[in-house]
């Protein structure tokens, strides 16, 4: 850790600070690093913005998301709240309002400085704003309140200021109280990291404890606070809030001195313009809020219009940075360049996402340079086939030129996602076309590299040119491209991006994959295609469809396509539709003009996507027209073989019959799919169109089909927006959502006016034809849009059938109104999409998995075709065409197109243009938004909401081949998702939007170590958590959203986990009517925490500790906040359910093999406890339960325990109610009739680490007993089942030979009639077996040893008790005194009988221990001492006998056996006399020069009105070592007696006396001061010990003084009497190295809080223990306390406040040392 000076110096050179959590340090970036980020924001008006990004270093994973919202506001407040993670940095910037000028720009770069102090980082990440003046205009300030003109006052303090430390420590101690269990578990795993004793004092003080926290160094504060795993999730926000509440602003000072200053700054909205370009930390005002752990992105909300708040997160040096541009409304041009000057390492992924929402009419022209390849200034349109280098992921940061859209490259994993918002103004012409290689002529459509396309709008194809159809564009052959992992991009070749958005990922095989398609669509003036364009995978930026795009015919509002003239071949549509052309794209050979796309050998035709809206598209591309069909010319031609006149695409290899949508490259099959993303592996997934997404499916290279995007709704160009490339693009957003209303009435997204005519998709009414969806890899798809087939063509029919009207075999589709023959994809009449769209299949294209699953139909959605189609993946063998699935469209929507996108998300309900929106590429895109969501209601009936659910349908969203998805970085991000099939997600999963597992579907979460669902999780089918490995860590599963609803099955199986499983179910609403089954870690029981629930199904837990009702600690909830159980809760394999909150209903808790712990039995109502095996029902004596708790199956072997001394026990044979009395409280249990009242007794044991009193039964249960006592022969299974040792109390002493261990199957073989029955069992010792009498009472001691208590039954003359065991057997003495078996043995046993009596009679316990043997060897045998402790009250005396092993002594000669002395203590009161006998070991004579170990015995007696309680504690004396025989250590005994009206209280404390010393250095000494304070309630006396000044010596000795101890007595009195505490602390040893005199150090007063009255728990404290300790600031803390805390399987997590107070002293000792 840096020293303070270094940390302060480092702060001036760092833009970002490192954060530490549990020892994990993240590196921070320094300014000197190679990567940089520029964010520029322009205010409204006509402004030009330029931003550049240079990536000069190899990068690791950088995921950033920048979102800027520009609106009519004049200012933008931007806040950057990046999160940091060890492996990735994802940042998100949001700007709302209008943009703020450059002031918001931030640079963050630099290589990270490792090992920066976690302290600096903590504050930096927390609420630390580095306040600087440089680089900002005078009017800019940071941290202002939302009001634009409001002035704020803050006090600036150093992070090291004691006031800041006190606030932090206050939060820390409060959090410790609220989450006691977590701190206990954490401390157990970090026992070497002690806490300052001040924390202990503050923890114990429930008042104003802050004064106890002074004096703790800043470094110590840092270690404690940042060292816990919940620092960033709980402590950080709480500390930030606490500092803010006190008006404290923290900053790293320039010197080590701590200063504070106050300043007031304000700014007005109009002055927040500045174009500062900060290059150092001082130029940035940041309010950083780093998030913890990897891959967490946070997006900060702008706080006000008037201020610039930027919060920057460090990007690690290895990460690339992003650039964000914000444009406000009005006319703004954006020019952006992305220069990648170095190859991104193959392993790296650079996801970035920029979203800009702008209002009307902005035209932007983007000039992105090639991604992975060399940088260049040429516009993306001119680049086609870049040779990408090996970098697996080509990142196109290009801002797609889409009209308003800004670019939003976002690459969540390996994929690049784009999520532009609806764009408004797109200029036609340039945008769509782009091709590397040759330029496109003015025509809108893309041109292709290779040869240029003539003026016709449509794209040209490289290799051969495509005739005029816009859509098509494709580079030569694509096949070779390997896939980049999830992401869309292709490795191998670069993707040129034909369209602006196209961005081609390298996918095209060698050349670009891209499908121009998207761009194709054209509405009157706008080139939708372009926006759609996005290239396959890559496209991150992609944006919008042209929605607002232009007004055609002037009269048309943006987005409206109505007046478009067919004009350009591809896109033209009369009326509003976009021509199909866009969809088409071709690789390898050219596609003929037809939209649908044709595929040449390998490429997928883009045509698919195209759809037509409104009127038919002109003959040009695919489109057919409703009414009349387009002649063959329209359709594509195919290289390889051409398809005859049918509109639809033709396919090379085999041709598809005319369906436009289909396109496929013959060869394409090879492409492997990339898992996660939709994309295809090998080939790119061009997926040009949004939905299409088709991942790489297209043949090798262009897997993509433009199709999807194509569809057009009346007004918006869906295709374009959809565009996003397949897999990749996740973010993609909207299709023209904003788009506009077409025909006035039509909202964007609506397809209402589309005429079927166009080949690819046309839908009558509103839907787009299926074409878009289809795309195929491998071979061409048959005529029907949807279908495509690899290998051989599928006939149009394939895709399927459509409800409403069926598609003819030809293209599949029929058209409502008039049908287009084979013409491409089918069109759908009214509501249904023709099967085609959904269908797509690649015959051969096995690799392509289908996304299908995801598909779902929106409400009405086209008939089955969709759904069924979804099958898609199933379809021909492998291909996943999935398009279908998503495709479905409800009546109005364009199914085909939308379907197109693989991703299920696509579907859109009527109004929205699903295709486009769906767009997002398949699986990937998690972020994806909605397509048009805002869009509009088309047909009013469907709202964007529909999309949502459909969207993503998991499958599509994540599906890859085999319907499984994994991510290269191990994390899968889910968008809003509905899973309707079987889907497997491998690795960590994070879902920040709603996830639904539909009925009949199954989601399998495989091998992930963490799952987080922070939005709704609804399980109507099956959700399974599984592991495929033999060893794995426990899973962290967190559900914290609004709703957690289970009607199906939620099952987790991980019993072999090597660490504790942690499941947290804390949603706002938790409802289970299905089956939730958790089988968690065995080695350390799993932990389950949940908020109040409503259960009408079943909860089944195995190996779990459950804490219900409170997430923030063991606090009782209000009655209105409890849970309702009307189902079953099953506890098995040691599971313990700790219930703190009220539970009502009419449910059942089945204890199969576990424990139920009730803290408030009176609030446990309507529930029945059923014993189905061994277990414990434990109750805290907090309040009487007015209604008996029904208990079924009680036999005495399964037990009921009260965690306080039971003074009386009674049984009502008429009602079957067993009642235990404790003081004034009663606890009743309805166990049923048939029991004998004389068979009940109470025994002491432990539960959850504390003493408990067990209600036992040893009598006969009548055969007529009620169901509550169904076991006919209680004890039939005998308590001493094999493992239990009869004489367990002997514990380790006879370990290997202990007869107890050899108890053989105990079966109740004998019942003694006529009197309370006892049970006999057979014990085997050596070679002899004996039958003895035992009870069924089994308990556990503080060490976790299980033993059986043997008892006698006074009223039976035939009852016998074990007296001894030896090689001849275990012997009993009958009531007549005769010995049943003669004892012949070298070993002997002693028996101690302890009897406790009350009004119901006496309870006798017999404990057998091995007696010491005489020995003639030179080594004495092990011996044992027995101490008897008796406690008496009005009800009688309770005696306990404890046996401990004596140490062995070693001697060269035979020594005499050890001897013992016995002391008898008698106390008498009105009830009689109580006599105690204590045996202690007497000193042995020794002939050696080493004295043997000795023990001292201290007797402590406490008296009150009920009598006296005496305890005897034996402790080992330390050995002494000397060259000569020295006198043994001696001890002094102090007796303290305090008397009041109630009598006297006497305590005896023994402390070790100082030893003689031969050193010349005196030990440290301490002074003791007694402070007494009195008030009306009495006097309170405190004793404070402080260190005295050290003595110095100029000499140095070789030996040190022995340890000495001081004793402090503290007495506190109140109306109830006085409480005296005696504390012994160790005096530190003197050191012989002292050579200089030092001043007396500061002394501190330590105050102990009131502890509970002495109880038997104090026996758990050995040696000197105390909560009081001294702590010198000039030296390391001196530990003076020790302690023990006993837990049983973590059950202590359930101790309530009352029980916890009794253990707090022990806890403090254990936790803080």
From Swiss-Prot:
Location, primary (coarse class): secreted
Post-translational changes noted in the entry: The GPI-anchor is attached to the protein in the endoplasmic reticulum and serves to target the protein to the cell surface. There, the glucosamine-inositol phospholipid moiety is cleaved off and the GPI-modified mannoprotein is covalently attached via its lipidless GPI glycan remnant to the 1,6-beta-glucan of the outer cell wall layer.
Keyword flag Glycoprotein: yes
Pfam families, per the entry: SRP1_TIP1 (PF00660)
Gene Ontology CC terms, in alphabetical order: extracellular region; fungal-type cell wall; fungal-type vacuole; side of membrane
Signal peptide: 1-23
Cell location: Secreted, Cell wall; Membrane
One of the record's GO molecular function terms: structural constituent of cell wall
Compositional bias per record (Polar residues), positions renumbered to this chain: 276-327, 359-368
Biotechnology section: Responsible for the thick foam layer formation on the sake mash during the fermentation process.
Disordered: annotated span: 80-117, 256-327, 359-939, 1582-1603
Lipidation (GPI-anchor amidated alanine): 1692
InterPro entries: SRP1_TIP1 (IPR000992), Yeast_SRP1/TIP1_CWP (IPR050788)
Swiss-Prot/TrEMBL keywords: Cell wall, Cell wall biogenesis/degradation, Glycoprotein, GPI-anchor, Lipoprotein, Membrane, Secreted, Signal
Propeptide boundaries: 1693-1713
Entry annotated with the keyword tRNA processing: no
Gene Ontology biological-process entries: fungal-type cell wall organization
Residues linked to a glycan: 34, 1133, 1241, 1278
Membrane topology of this protein: Lipid-anchor; GPI-anchor
Function: Involved in cell wall organization and biosynthesis. Confers cell surface hydrophobicity (CSH).
Note from the entry: 'Awa' means 'foam' in Japanese.
Protein name (record): Cell wall protein AWA1
Natural source organism: Saccharomyces cerevisiae (strain Kyokai no. 7 / NBRC 101557)
């Amino acid at each position: 850790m840096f020293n303070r000076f270094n940390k302060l110096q480092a702060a001036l050179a760092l833009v970002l600070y490192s954060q530490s959590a549990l020892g994990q340090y993240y590196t921070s970036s320094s300014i000197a690093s190679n990567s940089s980020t520029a964010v520029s924001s322009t205010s409204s008006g006509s402004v030009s913005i330029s931003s550049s990004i240079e990536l000069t270093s190899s990068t690791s994973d950088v995921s950033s998301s920048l979102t800027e919202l520009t609106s009519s506001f004049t200012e933008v407040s931007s806040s950057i709240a990046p999160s940091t993670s060890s492996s990735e940095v994802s940042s998100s910037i949001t700007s709302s309002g209008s943009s703020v000028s450059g002031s918001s720009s931030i640079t963050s770069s630099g290589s990270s400085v490792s090992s920066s102090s976690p302290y600096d980082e903590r504050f930096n990440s927390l609420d630390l704003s580095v306040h600087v003046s440089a680089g900002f205009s005078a009017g800019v300030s940071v941290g202002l309140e939302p009001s634009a003109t409001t002035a704020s006052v803050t006090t600036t303090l150093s992070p090291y200021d004691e006031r800041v430390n006190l606030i932090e420590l206050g939060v820390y101690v409060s959090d410790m109280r609220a989450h006691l269990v977590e701190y206990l578990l954490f401390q157990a795993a970090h026992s070497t990291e002690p806490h300052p004793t001040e924390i202990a004092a503050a923890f114990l003080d429930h008042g104003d404890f802050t004064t106890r926290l002074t004096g703790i160094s800043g470094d110590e504060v840092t270690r404690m606070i940042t060292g816990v795993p919940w620092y960033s999730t709980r402590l950080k926000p709480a500390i930030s809030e606490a500092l803010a509440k006190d008006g404290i602003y923290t900053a790293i000072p320039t010197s080590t001195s701590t200063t504070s200053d106050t300043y007031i700054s304000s700014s007005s909205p109009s002055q927040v313009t500045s174009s500062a370009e900060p290059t150092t930390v001082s130029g940035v005002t940041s309010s950083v809020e780093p998030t913890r752990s990897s891959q967490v992105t946070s997006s900060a909300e702008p706080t006000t219009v008037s201020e610039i708040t930027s919060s920057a997160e460090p990007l690690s040096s290895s990460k690339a940075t992003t650039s964000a541009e914000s444009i406000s409304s009005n006319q703004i041009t954006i020019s952006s360049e992305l220069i990648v000057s170095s190859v991104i390492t193959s392993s790296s992924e650079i996801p970035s996402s920029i979203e800009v929402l702008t209002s009307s009419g902005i035209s932007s022209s983007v000039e992105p340079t090639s991604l992975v390849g060399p940088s260049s200034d040429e516009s993306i349109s001119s680049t086609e086939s870049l040779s990408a280098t090996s970098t697996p992921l080509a990142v196109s940061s290009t801002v797609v030129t889409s009209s308003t859209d800004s670019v939003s490259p976002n690459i969540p994993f390996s994929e690049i996602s784009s999520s532009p918002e609806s764009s408004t103004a797109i200029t036609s012409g340039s945008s769509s076309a782009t091709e590397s290689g040759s330029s496109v002529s003015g025509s809108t459509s893309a041109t292709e590299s290779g040869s240029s396309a003539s003026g016709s709008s449509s794209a040209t194809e490289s290799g051969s040119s495509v005739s005029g159809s816009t859509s098509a564009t494709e580079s030569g052959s694509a096949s070779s491209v390997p896939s980049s992992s999830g992401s869309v991009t292709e490795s191998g070749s670069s993707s040129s991006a034909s369209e602006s958005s196209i961005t081609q990922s390298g996918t095209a095989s060698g050349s670009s994959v891209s499908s121009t398609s998207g761009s194709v669509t054209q509405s009157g003036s706008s080139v939708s295609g372009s926006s759609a364009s996005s290239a396959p995978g890559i496209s991150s930026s992609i944006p919008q469809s042209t929605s607002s795009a232009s007004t055609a015919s002037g009269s048309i509002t943006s987005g409206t396509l109505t007046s478009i003239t067919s004009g350009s071949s591809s896109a033209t549509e009369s009326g509003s539709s976009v021509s199909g052309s866009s969809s088409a794209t071709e690789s390898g050979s050219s596609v003929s003009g037809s939209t649908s796309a044709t595929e040449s050998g390998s490429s997928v035709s883009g045509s698919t996507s195209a759809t037509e809206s409104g009127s038919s598209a002109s003959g040009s591309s695919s489109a057919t027209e409703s009414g009349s069909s387009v002649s063959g010319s329209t359709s594509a031609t195919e290289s390889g073989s051409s398809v005859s006149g049918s509109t639809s695409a033709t396919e090379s290899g085999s041709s598809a019959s005319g369906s436009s949508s289909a396109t496929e490259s013959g060869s394409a099959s090879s492409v492997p799919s990339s898992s996660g993303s939709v994309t295809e592996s090998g080939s790119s997934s061009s997926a040009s169109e949004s939905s299409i997404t088709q991942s790489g499916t297209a043949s090798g290279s262009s897997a993509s089909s433009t199709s999807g995007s194509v569809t057009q709704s009346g007004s918006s160009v869906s295709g374009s927006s959809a565009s996003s490339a397949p897999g990749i693009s996740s973010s993609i957003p909207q299709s023209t959502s904003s788009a506009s209303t077409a025909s006035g009435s039509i909202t964007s997204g609506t397809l209402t006016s589309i005429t079927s005519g166009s080949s690819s998709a046309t839908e009558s009414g509103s839907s787009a034809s299926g074409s878009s969806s289809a795309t195929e890899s491998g071979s061409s798809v048959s005529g029907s849009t949807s279908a495509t087939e690899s290998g051989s063509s599928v006939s149009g029919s394939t895709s399927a059938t459509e409800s409403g009207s069926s598609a003819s075999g030809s293209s599949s589709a029929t058209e409502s109104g008039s049908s287009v023959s084979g013409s491409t994809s089918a069109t759908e009449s009214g509501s249904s999409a023709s099967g085609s769209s959904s269908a797509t299949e690649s015959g051969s294209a096995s690799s392509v998995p289908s996304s299908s699953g995801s598909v779902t139909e929106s409400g009405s959605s086209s008939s089955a075709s969709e759904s069924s189609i979804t099958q898609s993946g199933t379809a021909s063998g492998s291909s996943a065409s999935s398009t279908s699935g998503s495709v479905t469209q409800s009546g109005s929507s364009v199914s085909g197109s939308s379907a197109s996108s693989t991703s299920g998300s696509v579907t859109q309900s009527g109004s929205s243009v699903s295709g486009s929106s769906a767009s997002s590429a398949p699986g990937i895109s998690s972020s994806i938004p909605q397509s048009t969501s805002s869009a509009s209601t088309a047909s009013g009936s469907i709202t964007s909401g529909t999309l949502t659910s459909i969207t993503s349908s998991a499958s599509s969203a994540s599906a890859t081949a085999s319907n499984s998805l994994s991510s290269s970085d191990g994390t899968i991000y889910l968008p809003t998702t509905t899973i309707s099939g079987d889907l497997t997600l491998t690795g960590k999963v994070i879902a920040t939007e709603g996830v639904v597992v539909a009925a009949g579907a199954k989601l399998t979460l495989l091998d992930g170590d963490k799952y987080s669902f922070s939005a709704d999780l609804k399980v109507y089918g099956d959700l399974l958590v599984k592991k495929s490995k033999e060893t794995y860590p426990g899973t962290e599963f967190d559900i914290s959203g609004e709703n957690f609803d289970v009607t199906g099955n939620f099952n987790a199986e991980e019993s072999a986990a090597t660490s504790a499983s942690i499941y947290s179910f804390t949603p706002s609403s938790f409802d289970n009517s299905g089956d939730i089954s958790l089988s968690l870690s065995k080695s350390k029981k799993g932990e389950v925490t949940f908020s109040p629930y409503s259960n009408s199904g079943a909860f089944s837990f195995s190996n779990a500790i459950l804490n219900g009702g409170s997430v923030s600690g063991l606090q009782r909830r209000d009655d209105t906040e409890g849970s309702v159980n009307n189902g079953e809760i099953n506890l098995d394999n040691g599971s313990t359910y700790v219930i703190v909150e009220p539970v009502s209903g009419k449910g059942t808790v089945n204890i199969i093999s576990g424990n139920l712990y009730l803290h408030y039995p009176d609030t446990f109502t309507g529930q029945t406890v059923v014993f189905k095996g061994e277990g414990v029902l434990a109750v805290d004596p907090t309040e009487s339960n007015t209604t008996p708790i029904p208990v079924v199956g009680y036999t005495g072997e399964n037990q009921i325990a009260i965690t306080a001394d039971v003074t009386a026990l009674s049984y009502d044979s008429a009602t079957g109610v067993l009642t235990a009395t404790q003081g004034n409280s009663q606890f009743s249990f309805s166990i049923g009739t048939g029991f004998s009242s004389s068979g009940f007794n109470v025994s002491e044991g432990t539960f959850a680490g504390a003493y408990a009193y067990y209600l036992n039964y040893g009598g006969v249960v009548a055969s007529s007993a009620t169901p509550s006592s169904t076991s006919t022969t209680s004890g039939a299974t005998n308590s001493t089942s094999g493992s239990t040792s009869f004489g367990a109390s002997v514990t380790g002493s006879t370990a290997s030979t202990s007869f107890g261990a050899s108890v053989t199957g105990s079966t109740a073989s004998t019942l003694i009639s006529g009197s309370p029955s006892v049970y006999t069992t057979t014990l085997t010792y050596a070679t002899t077996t004996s039958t003895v009498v035992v009870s069924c009472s089994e308990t556990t001691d503080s060490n976790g040893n299980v033993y059986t208590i043997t008892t006698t039954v006074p009223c039976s003359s035939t009852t016998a008790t074990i007296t001894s065991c030896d090689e001849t057997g275990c012997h009993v003495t009958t009531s007549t005194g005769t010995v049943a078996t003669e004892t012949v043995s070298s070993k002997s046993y002693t028996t101690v009988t302890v009897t406790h009596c009350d009004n119901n009679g006496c309870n006798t316990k017999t404990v057998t221990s091995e007696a010491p043997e005489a020995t003639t060897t030179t080594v004495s045998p092990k011996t044992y001492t027995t101490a008897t402790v008796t406690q008496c009250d009005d009800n009688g005396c309770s005696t306990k006998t404890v046996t401990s092993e004596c140490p062995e002594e070693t001697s060269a000669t035979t020594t005499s056996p050890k001897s013992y002395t016995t002391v008898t203590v008698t106390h008498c009161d009105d009830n009689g006399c109580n006599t105690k006998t204590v045996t202690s070991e007497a000193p042995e004579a020794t002939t050696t020069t080493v004295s043997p170990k000795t023990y001292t015995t201290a007797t402590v007696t406490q008296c009150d009105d009920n009598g006296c309680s005496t305890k005897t504690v034996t402790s080992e004396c330390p050995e002494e070592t000397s060259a000569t025989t020295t006198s043994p250590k001696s001890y002094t005994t102090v007796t303290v007696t305090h008397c009041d009206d109630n009598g006297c209280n006497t305590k005896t404390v023994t402390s070790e006396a100082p030893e003689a010393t031969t050193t010349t250095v005196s030990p440290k000494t301490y002074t003791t001061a007694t402070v007494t304070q009195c008030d009306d309630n009495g006097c309170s006396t405190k004793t404070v010990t402080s260190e005295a000044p050290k003595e110095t010596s100029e000499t140095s000795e070789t030996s040190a003084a022995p340890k000495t101890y001081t004793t402090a007595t503290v007495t506190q009195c109140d109306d109830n009497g006085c409480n005296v505490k005696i504390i012994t602390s160790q005096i530190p040893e003197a050191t012989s190295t002292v050579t200089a005199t030092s001043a007396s150090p500061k002394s501190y007063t330590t105050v102990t809080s009131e502890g509970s009255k002495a109880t038997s728990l104090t026996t758990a404290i050995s040696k000197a223990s105390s909560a009081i300790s001294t702590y010198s600031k000039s030296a390391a803390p001196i530990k003076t306390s020790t302690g023990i805390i006993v837990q049983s399987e973590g059950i202590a997590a359930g101790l309530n406040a009352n029980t916890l107070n009794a253990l707090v002293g022990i806890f403090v000792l254990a936790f803080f040392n």
